[in-house]
Amino acid sequence: EQMQERLLLSMIEEAPAGSDFIVLPETVWPYAYDERYLPQAPVVTKIREILREKSSGAMIVTGAETIVYYPPEEQTETARQNERGAFYDKFNSTLGIDTTACLPIHHKGRLVIGVESTPTWIFKALKFLVIDLGGTVGQLGVGEPGPAFVHNGVSVGTPICYEGLYGNFYGGFVREGARALLISSNDGWWGDT
């Protein structure tokens, strides 16, 4: 996990000077992050430091696994309960990180059936059948096409991988104000591209 974080940071350091956006893969982050603490997470702080030093005008659009906790009366259909009784969802997300305090997040809304969209109780029984292609498996939380990430006056939608197969969903990013789409994916899903 530390090696993966070092690779993540080195990819950002190697980005060409003058880049407006740096797009990283869907599952590049080594941990799942609680969204309440994400803006202060050490890796986000390091990324912002690198951007200030090397690419102050850039926004990193990166995939990440995030966690949202709910009060019992507000839990979602996809929420699960942890050992302490708290309800939460894990999300396949994209983040927009720049040198400001703003940290927009998009939660994937079209999940891969059988990998990202499998109720936890079924997944536990059938886990031995799952092929690991990277990322989280099991039942994830579900998002909607979100408002565009705005950086330096440019509005971008940040769909994640499989969402690109759903034209109307994909178009939702444009309806929400995106002028460009930056898709975060693991290329292994698509073969030799």
Task: Please give the residue ranges for each predicted region.
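Enzyme catalytic cores with a strong preference for nitrogen-chemistry domains
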Residues: 1-193
